[in-house]
Regions:
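Flexible, compositionally biased loop and terminal segments
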Residues: 1-183
Length: 183
């Protein structure tokens, strides 16, 4: 049913949910709290101007063995979350392990716990083109994949704006292939 809603656009608002995947755990650890706050403010402000309601950020590489805290901001009405876990399977296991005993686990509630509010529209992969984040299987299922050829430390709100502008030019296929109607 959820797939049908996605495919038909039923219940879809004009807001956009973006996943950004970039940097390594070590690069994330080198950022100070002030640097994270400044970065999130720039991302949130740019996202707000583009009708984005949620930006979820994951590292592209590194070891999950060194703990890094989940960071959350609300900037200009945009929920920005930096979730420092490379391994999507471990992230799923952690969410399931921490599931409240009285809360029914459905596809919708599990999805919200894993990726935040709303369906993911676009996945921006930061760094050299062609790097597919295998840990983001859940996020890649129906989100449009866009490579951003900049270094993680240099990714800014302007880059996010470019991602959203490119996303808006695409014909959404929701996991399907483009069919050439002229043949």
């Amino acid at each position: 049913r959820r797939i049908a809603r996605r495919a038909t656009g039923e219940g879809r608002s004009r807001s956009i949910h973006v996943v950004v995947c970039g940097g390594s755990i070590d690069e994330w650890n080198r950022r100070t709290t002030d640097e994270w706050n400044l970065w999130a403010a720039g991302i949130g402000e740019s996202a707000s101007r583009q009708a984005v309601t949620s930006v979820t950020v994951y590292p592209l590489s590194g070891s999950d063995s060194r703990p890094v805290e989940v960071r959350r901001w609300s900037v200009a009405g945009v929920a920005v979350t930096a979730w420092p876990q490379v391994d999507g399977r471990q992230r799923l296991a952690d969410v399931v392990d921490a599931w409240p005993s009285g809360l029914a686990m459905t596809e919708e509630t599990l999805g919200r716990a894993l990726v935040g509010p709303g369906d993911i529209d676009v996945v921006a992969v930061i760094g050299a083109p062609g790097r597919l984040p295998s840990a983001l299987v859940w996020e890649l299922a129906y989100g449009e994949l866009i490579d951003v050829d900049v270094e993680w430390e240099a990714f800014t709100g302007e880059d996010l704006t470019s991602v959203i502008e490119e996303f808006r030019t695409r014909h959404r296929r929701f996991g399907g292939l483009h069919v050439d109607e002229t043949t």
